Each structure stands twice: as structure tokens, then as C-alpha cells.
Amino acid sequence: MNRYKISEEEVPYGILESFGLTREMVGDLPVDVLQAILSGRRSPILPIRVDDSEGNTIHARTRFSLVRREDGTVDVLFYPVLVESRLERFSEEQKQRLLEGKAVIAPMQDNNDNPAQAFHQIDSGTKQILSVPTPVIGRNLQIIADEFHLSHAEINCLQVGEPLTVAEGDDLMTIGIDLNEPTGILVCVGDGVQWKQEAKREWDKYNFGCFGCWVADGEGGLVYVHEDDYTEEMWNELKRSSQRRMQNANTPKM
């Protein structure tokens, strides 16, 4: 069984709904986002709400991911937005590099409570620390190094968390560690500035679905607006996007 590939029928909608994320809201996420979630990746930052034991409603912003338990069922992990990153276990130099968005290598505890070396990086959206064992990223780095014929000095540059720009024919390519990526490495066309822009995904302002629309909140996350609550601006944008789709569908392919 593939522990990381989850079918839509297995999604624990009941758990998500208890945190204010209805089946319709989840289904209205962009298709590429849904596919990523079903592959075990983390969601965008979304608003949730839950009632505590005293009946108070608590509102928060969080990412979530789907995980398969040992018994084969699927559960939900939440990654709430923190006020600030917890960096106590890192040196002052490592803290500075982490706050600059770079990856650092430092010990982490494995499942058997043994220290193991790992790459660490701050998720700028939630301020959570992302950690991946060094052998996993190291293997992927070696594949990239072979593909781009990187020197030992260039590989070392990547290992210490610095993006590397190389010439590939007539193009510039920039490579760097980004633990938000499935492979832990982001490769893009362009220089370091373009790499940073690529690493920080910007959502379209309006992401329309069947029942409502996910709207970019300006802070790297999304908020949901039901169709009944669309503003005039949203209706106009929906009309324009529908017209664009019709024009694209009617454009003859070369």
C-alpha cells in the first residue's frame, strides 16, 4: 500500500469539518493543491475554528496534511501558524540563517529518540520548523549535482543553505534547498532573486470553485467565501474568468 497516496474517498472529512473545513470548502481548493494534499503534502494556510470545552469558539490559521496510520486509516495533522519560530536548540549563527530563510544542518531526534543530522528550515507562512534527515536531501542533491555537473565547492554551497546559480546553455538556473518542495530542492530558471520569488508562492486573488471561492488573504494564506456572499467585484471577476476560459477553448490549436 502506498502510505503517501490517498484517494479522495479516504479523506477524513468528518475531522476536517469539526475544525470548520467542510467537504465543499476542501473540494473548492485548486486542483493542483488537492492533488498535493492527496499525495501527503501540506495544504496552504487556511482558517479553522473549533469549540473548546467551555463552548468558546477559537479561530486560528493552519496548514494540514493527511497521514496514513498503521491500521491503514487516514488521519489529519495540523501545523498552526505560530507567533514566532522556536529556535532555542539552534546556535546564534544558525538562528540568523534560519531567519533569513536558509536551511541549516543540525541534530534532530529520530523515532527511537536517537540524535540524527537533518536539514532544518523555517516555513515562512506558519513559522514552524521543517526538518528532513540529511540522507534524504543528500541523495536528491547528488542527483542534481550529477545533472548539472556541479563541483564539490558548489555542492557544499547548497549543503550550507545557499542558493546556487549556474549556466545551463543560454539560460541561468538557480538551485536551492526548499523543504516545502516534495524533493526538498527547488530548481528554477533565473537568478537568485527569481528563485526566492518562486519559493514564495503567491496565490491568485480569487480561486473559484463549485460552491465558493478561496480568496488570497495577503498574508500567504486563503480565506473562503461562499457563493451566496460574493461581492460585486467577485461576480465580475468570475464572469471575466469564464469568458477567458471560453475564448481559450475556442482558440484553434496550432
Please describe what each predicted stretch is:
Residues M1-Q35, H59-V83:
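Charged, compositionally biased non-catalytic regions
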Residues M1-R3, I48, M108-D113, R244-M254:
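Classical N-terminal secretory signal peptides
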Residues G20-V50, V81-N112, E147-L158:
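Short, flexible domain-boundary/linker segments around small modular repeats
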Residues D32, I58-S65, D113-F119, G161, ...:
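Short small/polar-residue motifs
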Residues L38-R42, E54-I58, E70, N112-N114, ...:
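Solvent-exposed loop and beta-edge segments used for protein-protein assembly and interaction
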Residues P47, I58-S65, E70-E92, E100, ...:
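Beta-strand-dominated lipid-handling architectures at cellular/organellar boundaries
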Residues R49-E54, S65-D71, Q109-D113, I122-T126, ...:
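Short, flexible beta-strand-to-coil junctions
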